[in-house]
A protein has these predicted regions:
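Basic, helix-initiating cap at the start of DNA-binding domains
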Residues: 1-37, 47-54
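Short, basic, alpha-helical segments at the C-terminal edge of helix-turn-helix-like DNA-binding modules
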Residues: 58-63
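Residues in the recognition helix of alpha-helical DNA-binding motifs
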Residues: 45-46, 133
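Hydrophobic alpha-helical connector segments
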Residues: 65-108, 127, 134-137
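Helix-turn-helix DNA-binding motif, specifically the short coil turn and the N-cap/start of the second
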Residues: 38, 126
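C-terminal peripheral helix-coil segments that are non-catalytic and often amphipathic
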Residues: 150-178
Length: 178
């Protein structure tokens, strides 16, 4: 083992495995193998797989990009922020089902919610509409993450990333028109 064994090293190894192979392949034995240690030594730092998943989701939340809206039209700032979050989650394909399960509503995600809500209000939505768009945009992201079918029978269809952009902008236009 080239690095000291600690929670950060364990979470980094877990993220590499989950990103590469998916959550189904994320076992303490695999993490230990990647770190060059025995599985039992991991238990000095984490209690069990459930705690490992919690730490992995905390790590995911810590990586959410919060874009500065300065110099950008308010609606475009909202679109850019949600695209950045979408791109972050696409890089961690395992995140869709974990977020959708709803088991990890973490206090550390509050700054992300606050930032997104401020952008939505800045785009002209009242609190109630901003909350609805916030929830709908999350469901939109999760739906795109969990439904990665290429829909190849739609010849000439735009790329799926374009579908996300279209749906997000349509959601915002509809909410702003109310």
């Amino acid at each position: 083992m080239t690095q000291p064994l600690n929670r950060a090293a364990i979470v980094a190894a877990a993220r590499r495995i989950a990103d590469r192979d998916g959550l189904a392949e994320l076992t303490l034995r695999r993490i230990a193998g990647e770190l060059g240690t025995g599985a039992a030594s991991l238990y000095r730092h984490i209690a069990d797989r459930q705690e490992l998943l919690l730490l992995l989701v905390e790590d995911l939340v810590a990586g959410y990009p919060l874009l500065d809206p300065a110099g950008v039209a308010p609606v475009e700032a909202v679109v850019r922020q949600w695209h950045a979050m979408y791109d972050h989650l696409v890089a961690h394909a395992w995140s869709g089902p974990v977020i959708a399960d709803g088991d990890y509503a973490l206090p550390s995600a509050k700054p992300v919610a606050d930032h997104c809500m401020a952008l939505l209000r800045g785009a002209g939505l009242d609190d109630a509409a901003a909350q609805r768009v916030y929830r709908a945009a999350w469901r939109l992201i999760i739906g795109h993450l969990m439904s990665r079918h290429p829909f190849g029978h739609l010849q000439g269809a735009p790329p799926q990333q374009d579908d996300f952009d279209w749906a997000l902008r349509t959601l915002l236009r509809g909410a702003l028109a109310e």
